[in-house]
C-alpha cells in the first residue's frame, strides 16, 4: 500500500512492510507555518473546531489525498500503522508546531477520545531519569510489557497516535511494535476459553478514572480474527484461572 502524494515521501519501513513511513517535505512544512500560527495551543484545547481547521490545512496541501491514505492504512489489517514526521527538523519546528501537526493528523482520522489524565483531547508528559508516578507509562528504565490502549475506559478505542516531541541524553528506548498476527502465542491464547471471559479492569489514581469496566482480553473482528485489549497493570482477576491466564 504505497501511494504517491506530492510533497510526501512514502515508503515501507525498513524493518517491516506492516509500517508505512511518511516524511513531510520542507515545502509542505513551510506552507503549514501560517495556518498553524492562527491558533495557539490554548485555542486548540478550548475550541474543538480549530482542531479540524488545522487538519484541513494539512489535507489541503495533499489535494485531500492524505486523509484517505491514512484511513486506508489503519483500516487495513495487513498494515494498520504509519510513522509520519517532518523530513527535516528546522528551527521553525518547535514543540507547539509538533502538537499541532499531531492534532491535524489525528483529526484527519477521526475525533480523539477525551484524556481524563490530562483533562484535554490529548495527553503530554515527560519521561525523566527519576519518576514517582503510579504507572509504567513514565518510567524510563522499566519495560512496558504487552500493552494496548483503552482497556480501562468506557470509550471505544480504535487507534492510537503517539508523538515524541523532544529527546535529550537518551540511549535506546525505541518504541516496540508487535502486530497481533505476528505474535507466536496469539492463536493459543485467543482459543483459550478464559480469554473470552469478562475481566475487571481498573486504573491507578493518576488516570483520573473513577470507575471500573468489564470486558474480555480477546474478542473477534467482523471476519472472526483476533482482537486484543490488554495492559498488564490494570486487570483484576476474579479467580485463579484468570490470574494464571494473564501470566
Give each language-model segment a name:
Residues 1-61, 76-78, 125-247:
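Active-site environment of non-heme Fe oxygenases that use a 2-His-1-carboxylate facial triad
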Residues 48-54, 72-92, 101:
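N-terminal, charged low-complexity regulatory/assembly segments
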Residues 62-69, 75:
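Short, solvent-exposed beta-alpha or beta-beta edge segments that form flexible loop/patches at the rim
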Residues 69-70, 175:
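Generic hydrophobic alpha-helical segments
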Residues 86, 116-120, 164:
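Glycine-rich, histidine-containing beta strand-loop boundary motifs that form or position
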Residues 88-95, 148, 152:
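Short, charged/polar micro-motifs that form catalytic or ligand-binding hotspots
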Residues 94-117, 240-247:
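Signature of the catalytic double-stranded beta-helix
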Residues 103-137:
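A gly/proline- and charged-residue-enriched helix-loop-helix capping module
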Amino acid at each position: 500500500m504505497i501511494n504517491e502524494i506530492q510533497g510526501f515521501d512514502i515508503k515501507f519501513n525498513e524493518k517491516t512492510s506492516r509500517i508505512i513511513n511518511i516524511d513531510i517535505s520542507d515545502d509542505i512544512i513551510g506552507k503549514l507555518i501560517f495556518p498553524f500560527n492562527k491558533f495557539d495551543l490554548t485555542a486548540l484545547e478550548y475550541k474543538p473546531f480549530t482542531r479540524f481547521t488545522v487538519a484541513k490545512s494539512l489535507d489541503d496541501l495533499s489535494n485531500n489525498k492524505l486523509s484517505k491514505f491514512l484511513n486506508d492504512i489503519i483500516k487495513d489489517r495487513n498494515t494498520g500503522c504509519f510513522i509520519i514526521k517532518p523530513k527535516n527538523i528546522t528551527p521553525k519546528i518547535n514543540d507547539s508546531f509538533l502538537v499541532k501537526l499531531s492534532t491535524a493528523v489525528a483529526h484527519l482520522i477521526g475525533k480523539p477520545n477525551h484524556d481524563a489524565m490530562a483533562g484535554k483531547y490529548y495527553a503530554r508528559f515527560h519521561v525523566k531519569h527519576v519518576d514517582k508516578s503510579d504507572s509504567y507509562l513514565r518510567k524510563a528504565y522499566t519495560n512496558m510489557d504487552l500493552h494496548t490502549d483503552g482497556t480501562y475506559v468506557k470509550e471505544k478505542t480504535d487507534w492510537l497516535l503517539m508523538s515524541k516531541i523532544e529527546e535529550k541524553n537518551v540511549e535506546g528506548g525505541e518504541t516496540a511494535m508487535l502486530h497481533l498476527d505476528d505474535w507466536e502465542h496469539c492463536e493459543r491464547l485467543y482459543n483459550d476459553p478464559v480469554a473470552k471471559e469478562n475481566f475487571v479492569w481498573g486504573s491507578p489514581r493518576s488516570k483520573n478514572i473513577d470507575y471500573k469496566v468489564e470486558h474480555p482480553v480477546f474478542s473477534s473482528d467482523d471476519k472472526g480474527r483476533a482482537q486484543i485489549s490488554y495492559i498488564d497493570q490494570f486487570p483484576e482477576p476474579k479467580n485463579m484461572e484468570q490470574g494464571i491466564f494473564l501470566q
